Design a protein with these regions (language model features):
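Ferredoxin-type iron-sulfur electron-transfer modules in oxidoreductases and energy-metabolism complexes
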Residues: 117-139, 156-260
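Iron-sulfur-associated redox domains of electron-transfer enzymes in respiratory
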Residues: 1-143, 149-153, 161-162, 176-182, ...
């Protein structure tokens, strides 16, 4: 019977009745197991955009496995922690300096590992027309079940453009590539790499990989970090009347009416 699972010092460890067994997490992931692909690429290892970040990095010595490292990231988090201590439900103490050093080293090591996986996954997509051809081929399996859209925390449009018949023809499978282009155009700059669009895809299309690869490129271009930077991303707000006037003034019939 398995009692506990954890990742510690580069090992995936299973504790069972009478002992434990560990295997290199690198070996596991090279073989296609281990963490989800999007988690491997993630560089947000300590969620400092939250009020409190809790984990075991930095907990050492006799407290290892028995205590939690709590990093206070906001005034609200500090107040919550103080109130818990006052209520007697929590006991705190200053972190061990050695533990802080180890915590920093572990976090930096995980950043490097994330960079390694990004390089591995993104280079596998190719560039330019080769990347586009790969995405078109992979998404040709799409059955338009809408799991990628319904599960996306960023996609919250009241009226979804992928359901407009003049953009995506009803009843056609696979849907024309406009279906995918709409998703990329709406989500790519704000993708937080949660992986749900890939996790729930009935046809095993690597949607999260495609979206994350585009998000990283857009982040390099515009500097917006989704999930961290709370300012509005580029072109987040458009005044409809002014935009209509601008489009009309171009005199081009190649400009699509985005308000239709």
């Amino acid at each position: 019977t398995v009692h506990k699972e954890e990742i510690d010092k580069g090992q995936f460890i299973i504790e069972y009745e009478g002992g434990h067994k560990g295997i290199s997490i690198d070996d596991l992931e090279e073989a296609g197991y281990g963490r989800r692909p999007n988690c491997r690429r993630c560089k947000l290892k300590v969620p400092r955009q939250a009020d409190l970040a809790c984990g075991n990095w930095g907990v050492i010595g006799d407290k290892a496995g028995k205590a939690t490292f709590v990093e206070v990231c906001s005034e609200k988090g500090a107040m919550l922690l103080d109130e818990a201590v006052k209520a007697g439900v929590l006991k705190t103490e200053a972190p061990n300096p050695k533990g802080l050093e180890i915590r920093g080293k572990v976090e930096n090591a995980m950043y490097k590992l994330a960079d390694k996986w990004r390089k591995h996954d993104f280079e596998g997509l190719g560039t330019g027309r080769d990347r586009l051809a790969k995405i078109v081929k992979e998404t040709s399996r799409c059955i338009k079940c809408y799991q990628c859209i319904d599960s996306c925390p960023i996609c919250y449009c009241v009226e979804c453009s992928t359901k407009k018949p003049y953009l995506v023809k009803p009843g056609e499978l696979p849907p024309n590539f406009m279906f995918q282009l709409i998703r990329f155009a709406h989500i790519a700059d704000s993708c937080i790499n949660c992986g749900q669009c890939q996790e729930l895809c009935a046809m095993d299309i690597p949607n999260a990989l495609f979206m994350h690869a585009q998000q990283v490129e857009l982040e390099k271009m515009f500097g917006h970090v989704p999930g961290i930077d709370m300012s509005l991303p580029l072109l987040a707000l458009v005044e409809e009347r002014e935009e209509r006037d601008r489009l009309a003034a171009t005199g081009s019939d190649q400009i699509f009416d985005i308000f239709k």
